[in-house]
Amino acid sequence: IFGLAIAYLAILFNLNFVCKNKRLRSLGRLAIPSSVFNINEPLVFGVPTVLNILTFIPSMICVAINLVVAYLSTAAGLMSKTCMSVPWTLPAPLYAFLSTMDYRAIIIWFVLFAINIIVFIPFMKSYDKQMDLEDEKLSEQGE
């Protein structure tokens, strides 16, 4: 619930609202339907998040933050423990609620989502600039 799934949605948010590169924005639009249901392969292989330092580092930071906050929230009684297994393809906030049967899990999920977006912004801006330079090189070679 609170691991990498939130980070992928933060990447998706940044692709659609922070990045200006045409390729990244179109990837962001194309990945929305599948990412809503936790199918993140378009992002994993399209951005890519594997072997790309500008997406790998913030992903690991976000996973650490998400897991620590979720654990501490559960330990402190801010949300209930996970009490049931639900299908992984449910939209993430609904997954958080149904697996804990606690509305506070949704609140914590959205707080973590906002934190993940903030963590990713500088990295995605750098990646956006890198993609722009790549596009310039490709257009120069084509001329």
Predicted regions and their residues:
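Transmembrane alpha-helical segments and their short flanking loops
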Residues: 1, 10-12, 30, 44-143
